[in-house]
Amino acid sequence: MTQLETRTEPMVLNFGPHHPSMHGVLRLVVTLDGEDVVDCEPVIGYLHRGMEKIAENRTNVMFVPYVSRWDYAAGMFNEAITVNAPERLADVKVPRRASYIRVMMLELNRIANHLLWLGPFLADVGAQTPFFYIFREREMIYDLWEAATGQRMVNNNYFRIGGVAADLPYGWLEKLDDFCNWFGPKIDEYEKLITNNPIFRRRIEGLGTITREQAINWSLSGPMLRASGVAWDLRKVDHYECYDDFDWEVATAQEGCCFARYRVRLQEMRESLKILRQAAQQIPGGPTENLEAKRQLEGKDSEFYGFDYQIVAKKVAPTFKIPNGQLYTRVESGKGELGVFLMGNNDVTPWRWKIRAADFNNLQILPHLLKGVKVADIMAILGSIDVIMGSVDR
């Protein structure tokens, strides 16, 4: 009796760019030997819109509404880096009240970003219920953004060079406090529902492991880096905005696997709540209604008309010129280090505007992580990276 030859030639399979489990228009050209992944080549660029060239043909005031389309799950971070770069180059000071408002918007966006990661990630590994829960929480964040900026998800157009577009509306800080009190127990609910679920843990624990050295060598950032034991958070490292005024910890894990990245993001949401509560209590001038009452009571000589109680240093003219010089500035977005290299030549438009997107760099390690795993694990590992193709392709 002859023995049948079971080995076959490797098969090349395309995942995406229209596959429902792809996080945007990403295409993976995967080489398979049976169920085992031999090689993987990510193909990007399907959502390229020339954002850098658009920036180089717009004034800063004109470009801010565009930037929500880089990472459309975290538009506030895009706006922050877009105004931070000219501020630093032109040495524009930001009032403390405006800085506190910025921090509150950024931390709300961090929570919204992690929630939008959590739902689809769990859906990728087979847990459907949390996918619906996360939109319940995000809805409250949308309501806060809508009250302050007029827009709910993207295109808030709220940050300005030297501050923010408008002060917080009456009662906003009270609504923020209600959200913090309501959302804290919801994270505990996620922990009970997900973290110690034996099926979930067996599905992703030990999967897609990245060592500390690999994370550093691949220039990873954000939860991808901190889940491998590197306590690197730009809010602590660069001391930008007013983060030094608050008591909070950098969320880290040591294992470097998909489960560690999940735990880091959950802990980051808890730390963001800490920052939000402290910012709401410590904001210079307090709630807008109290600040305006103090100004009216004390008259024009009131200290509450001082620089630190303003929402913008000075209204930026449409003809604002970016000075000669160059710099690289960065913020800690929900996905990692979001940076901009800006080169000015004393003109209203930048000479060079280079975007350093966190998920673009983090996506580079995907082929390394996928070699040797099963086909079923591809989506779990990709989901743990947290990519938005608008940011990757720009």
UniProtKB/Swiss-Prot annotation:
NCBIfam families according to UniProt: PRK06075.1 (NF004739), PRK07415.1 (NF005649)
Alphabetically ordered keywords of this record: Membrane, NAD, NADP, Plastoquinone, Quinone, Thylakoid, Translocase, Transport
GO molecular function: NAD binding; oxidoreductase activity, acting on NAD(P)H, quinone or similar compound as acceptor; quinone binding
Catalytic activity: a plastoquinone + NADH + (n+1) H(+)(in) = a plastoquinol + NAD(+) + n H(+)(out); a plastoquinone + NADPH + (n+1) H(+)(in) = a plastoquinol + NADP(+) + n H(+)(out)
Subcellular location, record wording: Cellular thylakoid membrane
GO biological process: photosynthesis, light reaction
Amino-acid biosynthesis keyword on record: no
Species for this entry: Synechococcus sp. (strain RCC307)
Official protein name in the record: NAD(P)H-quinone oxidoreductase subunit H
Membrane association type: Peripheral membrane protein
Function: NDH-1 shuttles electrons from an unknown electron donor, via FMN and iron-sulfur (Fe-S) centers, to quinones in the respiratory and/or the photosynthetic chain. The immediate electron acceptor for the enzyme in this species is believed to be plastoquinone. Couples the redox reaction to proton translocation, and thus conserves the redox energy in a proton gradient. Cyanobacterial NDH-1 also plays a role in inorganic carbon-concentration.
